[in-house]
Amino acid sequence: MKNSGYCLSLICLFISLCLYGCKDNAEESITEIFEIATEDLIQNFSKDAANVSISITTNLNVDNWEAKVTDKWLRATQFKNSLKISVDANIGSNRRTANVKVSSATKHYTITVTQYSASDIVIEEDIQVKPYAGKASEEETDPDRSIEHSFDNKFIADGGVPYHSKWGQSADFPVILEYYFEGNTDIDYFIYHTNSGNGTFGKFDVYTQTKENTEYVHQGSYDFNMRNSPSIASLKTPVKATKVKFEVHSGKNGYVSCDEMQFFKKNKKNTLEEQLLTVFTDITCSEIKPDVTQEQIEALPEFFIQTASALKDDSYNKWEKEFRIREYCPYSSADEWADKLMTRKYGDLDNPTGIYVNEGDEVVVLVGNTHGQSISIQNIGEETSKGYAQTSVNGDIYPLKEGVNKLTAKQTGMLFVMYNTNIQNPDAQPIKIHIPLGGGKVCGFFSLKEHQTNEKYKELIDKADYKYFCVIGNAIILYFHHKQLKAAVPYDILSSIELWDNMIQWQQELMGIEDVYPKQMNNHIFAISPEGGYMWASEGRIGFVYTVLGDILRKSYLMASRNSWGPAHEIGHVHQGAINWASTTESSNNLFSNYTIYKFGQNCSRGTELAVPEYAANVKKATLVFRRCVENKAWCDFGTDYQGEDPEMHARMNWQLWNYYHRCGYNPQFFPTLFKLMRENRVSTQDPGENQMMYARMACRAANENLTDFFERWGF
């Protein structure tokens, strides 16, 4: 017994020693980790107040390391695995530098923070050559819209009025606009500023006269594609013109208009660009020459030192660099193709920069080879004309030329590059643009083509700090409230984009534009999230109130109980033009709505029953049989609104035709053929009777059979 007790004591002692030894070994095996990446040790800021978060790899508590700043305009805030560095606005005229000293028991780092001052660059502007008089072959006189308004330097945005051909009638093409000059200064190029509506230029020719040659000489043929943005075009050769003649052959909606026509001589003295090219490989300043010295960099204007230094020491933030230095692809003219395809205008904001500005911000835009194409930048802000905030359909537009451009923002907004042209033109090549550090603030965007994954979407939307965030699909652009978008789709954006792209592409199938989209026309439909209203469609955009984003973006909801009807209905408004006439505005587009819910494969079609069987006593609305066979009413009297429209009933006519020819397989090309025929055989008036009869005739031709009985049954 004594031996047993003795043995037990020895065993306990042995176990205690083992445990104690294990504890010592465990404590000794813990290695302190405290690492800051080398690329984070240099931080550059522009003049504005800002902050950046630096990742720290560590297993230490916040209390076990510290960060101290060396100047009062600089602050450092410690977190578990990161360090936030903040700077005040630099209101001085000089660059300033300070340090953040970070220390732990094992590692010490010095983070060098440089903040640059306000832009000090001076742009050598080209020389404007002003006409002293002008003459037009036709112009509106009541009210006065004479050609003088196109060279008075008073833009519409500033309270001016444009030149406009006669109202209420198609222009007598070609419309001739002549501008008269002293003839003492070369003219190299001109900028055509549009009237944001009717009359934007399509095709035209330009001719010039000189003191030596009083006969007009052809300078070139141009096509501005009726796009609603300033367009720049060069003359074939510089000329000291006494007259410049525009022979306009086409304009939007059959009119001709011009806000301002400006003529310029290029400034041959451009010391800034010459200086930049001693350091950078090209004028976009996106890469420095390999043998550049710090002395050469320091000789640049202060504004460009920041960019050159960031490129030289590889401290240009990768996220910022992705959106500040980009190649922008060409897009078609949404105005031109709306006319050709008989649709409402698609969006033309296809090229977001991911950079926003505040009112008063100065932004430098560096433009590379334009390949002779016309580009500009547009600042899209908000409008409140309806009593609530929503994204504007257009904003201040700044024409861009190759080289250094500088603009001052008149409002807070997102910058979009406007590069709209004939995309089949061999010269329609990507254009490289750099918006350097210190100009605007990066918010970013998500592009399905570029970023591709849900993980990348989450990373980008988490970094964004602007009110709106842009998601680019193949056919749709969602420009929605950042906060509500993130709440509705925190991660799985790919399924949302797929649904919206599909809705648009299915509708395009019915329209028969497979030979057009995207080879000739490649614009997106542009969706916004107003803070009032509900769902609607207009020229250039469709709207969904920001409180329903969860309903229209989540796949599980959109696929259930015909919830895709609303989005498909609004997209249908964009596409319905060829089969629409007065009294069908809210019903002809429902061909697309019904087709969408059919393609989703979840639900039956929607609309009033054609007849009421005995067991359907719960049907409250009048049916086709009741309207035609009991009341003997015509199509235009089916409804009770001011146009006689009954959307639920009228929508059934197109859907009957689709079911018979497409679903039953009698002619699966019926609707694509019908849309093409309607585009080829347009009615020149808005008269609903003429349009209705044209629809019936073209439907017979598309079906290759007589549908008279069918349309008579529908009250034609």
Q: What are the residue ranges of the model-derived segments?
A:
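Pan-zinc metallopeptidase signature
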Residues: 272-328, 334, 653-716
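Surface-exposed binding patches on compact interaction domains or structured appendages
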Residues: 55-84
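A short beta-strand micro-motif common to beta-rich folds, especially ectodomain repeats
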Residues: 94-105
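Bacterial Sec-dependent N-terminal signal peptides
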Residues: 13-42, 105-129, 268-274
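Catalytic cores of extracellular degradative/oxidative enzymes
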Residues: 457-659, 668-671
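Beta-strand-enriched, solvent-exposed domains that form extended recognition/catalytic surfaces
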Residues: 275-444
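Solvent-exposed, low-complexity, repeat-rich "mucin-like" stalks and linkers
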Residues: 27, 37-66, 365, 692
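Aromatic, loop-rich ligand-recognition surfaces of beta-strand-rich domains
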Residues: 158-213, 229-274
